[in-house]
Regions:
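Active-site-adjacent structural elements that line small-molecule/cofactor binding pockets in enzymes
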Residues: 13-357
Length: 357
């Protein structure tokens, strides 16, 4: 049996030198908490306004992502719809491949499929299987979906699920579905560089964390003899835009406080944020909730973990992400004090300034 565990050697130094030339596109990353009709309204706007991609999450227990994605693909014409992300605990990897093939049939060439362990969520729900190995489970699911949607049988023997040797999809899509990983840790970034088509950075991100993630992705790609520039590094970038700079910046503070209190340590450590400012927010959230955290959240933390303000502020804030190696920013969650106005400003003023022509 082929083994990939031996690839976890000591970290390799890889230098990434990139010049800001613009992003491959600009997308929207939506909330899973809104009613489906609201989500589909934003998807329709993204399709109409020229965004390259819209990402649909499956966090917590609000909406199941697959039926929403199916309707999104059926009712749009040009925008790519991303599953961002599904996990191979709630769904068997073969079922994930079948769902990917079905979605690809609904929207040919417009599906990007994100998989991730969603470890915090799975454990919080008490759904972690006995002896669960999140990294192994994710890698095997990624390899399974990529092989089966390419019309091939598995080229490895899975250890986290069972499948008959030689099994293939009865009707694979016309072309393989690109599969990304919702990665956070060093090891997950590196195996993504080996086996996936890209990585989607989730929750809150920063320029420093993006640069670190690109380096780790390159390490994995190098091990597999792949070119990291052929992979897609995307990220949920906490974004708020509006005509009033102060209102737009204030609009991200509560959600930023929520995630600063919960996000994995590496996300904050690699960001270069003021540790005392982060500690103050965490203490306030622990005592009084997200609103209390937002009240003590400094402007410096907004600068590190969000792009927020006027359209010019957002354009300026996105530039360093491209220099750090981000290919596709996914404006995430807030959009602005007025959601619809924020989406319009992103399309009309921000996107033309930051996307490659």
């Amino acid at each position: 049996m082929e083994s990939w565990r031996s690839t976890f050697a000591a970290p390799v130094a890889v230098t990434i030198v990139r010049k800001m030339t613009g992003f491959r596109g600009l997308g929207l990353s939506l909330s899973n908490e809104d009613p489906v009709a609201d989500t589909l309204a934003v998807v329709a706007a993204a399709d109409r306004l020229g965004f390259e991609e819209v990402s649909l999450p499956e966090s917590r227990l609000f909406n199941s992502v697959m039926p929403v994605a199916a309707v999104a693909l059926h009712t749009t014409r040009r925008v790519t719809v991303r599953i961002g992300v599904a996990n191979p605990v709630f769904r068997d990897p073969v079922l994930l491949a079948l769902e990917a093939a079905t979605l690809a049939d609904i929207g040919p060439g417009r599906l990007r499929y994100g998989l991730g362990a969603a470890e915090w969520t799975v454990r919080r729900f008490g759904m972690a299987p006995p002896g669960w190995r999140p990294l192994t489970n994710t890698v095997e699911a990624v390899r399974t979906v990529r092989r089966l949607t390419a019309g091939e049988a598995l080229d490895f023997e899975p250890t986290t699920f069972t499948v008959a040797p030689g099994l293939r999809l009865d009707r694979p899509p016309a072309s393989p579905v690109p599969v990304d990983v919702g990665a956070v840790s060093r090891r997950m970034m590196e195996v993504s560089g080996q086996y996936a088509d890209g990585v989607q950075l989730g929750a809150i991100t920063s320029v420093g964390y993006t640069r670190w993630a690109r380096e780790r992705l390159a390490v994995g790609a190098q091990r597999a003899g792949r070119d990291v520039d052929e992979l897609l590094l995307s990220a949920n970038v906490l974004t708020s835009v509006g005509p009033d700079r102060t209102e737009a910046r204030n609009a991200v503070k509560e959600v930023l406080a929520y995630y600063l209190a919960r996000v994995e340590g590496v996300v904050v450590d690699e960001a270069g944020a003021d540790p005392e400012a982060v500690a103050a927010v965490r203490a306030a959230v622990a005592e009084g909730g997200e609103q209390a955290g937002a009240a003590v959240l400094s402007d410096s933390l907004v600068d590190v973990f969000a792009v927020a303000g006027t359209p010019d502020d957002v354009i300026e804030g996105l530039g360093p992400f491209a220099d750090a190696g981000l290919d596709l920013p996914l404006a995430w969650y807030t959009f602005g004090p007025d959601r619809d106005e924020g989406v319009r400003l992103l399309a009309e003023q921000v996107r033309p300034a930051v996307v490659q022509t």
